[in-house]
Amino acid sequence: MIPLSEMMINLKEDASSNYGDIINRQNKILGNMLGSEIDFLIKGIDNKTRAVAASRKDAMLKKRQIFYLPDANGVSRVCEGRIVQARVLAVAEKTARVEIFGVEYSISARDLSYDWMGDATDSYHVGDQILVRITHVSVTSVSDITVKADVKSVIGNASAENLKKCKVQGKYIGTVTDIHKGTVFIRLSIGVNAVAHSCYDSRLPGKKDEVSFVVTRIDSERNVAVGLISRIVKQNI
């Protein structure tokens, strides 16, 4: 048994926050973590009830001491530029929350992959162990450590190479990953990011729709194919 207070779910409080709100938010975060792998230290054992009391907080602080604080030579195990393993704690549509040796960080979809990603839950799952590259570390004390990381720099970017497969006036099948201010963002099946500013189908495209895309221009600087949606092949209903 691990008390909520020992799960080290730290939320920023403001003047409008109250105790009930904080508890509800913490419970929601815990719900999203179901199935994740965590560390804990045993604090006590009740032989009568065969219950064990434990603390995730103590385990995370211990890992922070080992991996983030400088050793006798003044070197930290986790530093900027290093590739390390992280645990996926929770996944939402546009973000994945990971634990990196006792420190939690939410990686946005744009840092998960160079490929446009409509839904991170399609590629990442609670309990996964992934490689991330540390992009920033700030250590004030063992209880005050912030870290930033990405996944895309580890897996690499094949967009430029895949873009060579695209031809102007070529037709390709793709999936709508996002729509913003009338612009439709598409991930083509040939591994290319594409942008459509118009749709010739009488129906409006929606996220996760499968569409037929016609290339009108290739933007080599941004590694993006520009064009239009000729028709919606399959709607995501």
What spans do the regions from the language model cover?
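Single-stranded RNA-binding regions, centering on S1/OB-family and related RNA-binding modules
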Residues: 1-237
